[in-house]
């Protein structure tokens, strides 16, 4: 019986799944939008949203926790210097999933996962230039 077992297996063992979501979380933080399959996007939400919540309070302990979960100093810096302050007034719901059809090879449902204030932040960068 699978009672109280949360999360998707995605046909991977636990270490592969952990490494995949660590890499995907880093890519999402770095690029602020990525394209992946719909089940992976839904599962990635459960990894990224707590990281952004952690980044809203900048202290050494939280930075170390974020590094333990991402293993990338560049990602930790962006989380705490950009994303934490950007989402300071938002109480959760930092990501958006947009369905975008089906993959050609295997007809897998595809989706974009993005950070919700991405368009506004990109517009500010263009205006600053």
Swiss-Prot record:
Recorded superkingdom: Bacteria
Coiled-coil annotated spans: none
Xref: InterPro entries: Ribosomal_bL17 (IPR000456), Ribosomal_bL17_CS (IPR047859), Ribosomal_bL17_sf (IPR036373)
Alphabetic keyword roster: Ribonucleoprotein, Ribosomal protein
Gene Ontology CC: cytosolic large ribosomal subunit
UniProt record, GO biological process: translation
Gene3D superfamilies referenced in this protein's UniProt entry, alphabetically: Ribosomal protein L17
Protein's UniProt keywords contain Disulfide bond: no
A Pfam family that the UniProt record links to this protein: Ribosomal_L17
MF (Gene Ontology): structural constituent of ribosome
Protein family: Belongs to the bacterial ribosomal protein bL17 family.
HAMAP family assigned: Ribosomal_bL17
Complexes and interactors: Part of the 50S ribosomal subunit. Contacts protein L32.
NCBIfam families from the UniProt entry: L17
Record protein name field: Large ribosomal subunit protein bL17
Organism, scientific name: Yersinia pestis
This protein's encoding gene: rplQ
């Amino acid at each position: 019986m699978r009672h109280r077992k949360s999360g998707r297996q995605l046909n991977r063992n636990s270490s592969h799944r952990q490494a995949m979501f660590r890499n995907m979380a880093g890519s999402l933080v770095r690029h602020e939008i990525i394209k992946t399959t719909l089940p992976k996007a839904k599962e990635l939400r459960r990894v990224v949203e707590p990281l952004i919540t952690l980044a809203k309070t900048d202290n050494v302990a939280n930075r170390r926790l974020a590094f333990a979960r991402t293993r990338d100093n560049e990602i930790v810096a962006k989380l705490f210097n950009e994303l934490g302050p950007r989402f300071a007034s938002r109480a959760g719901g930092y990501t958006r999933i947009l369905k975008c059809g089906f993959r050609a090879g295997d007809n897998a449902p595809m989706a974009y996962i993005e950070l919700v204030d991405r368009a506004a932040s990109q517009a500010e960068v263009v205006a600053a230039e």
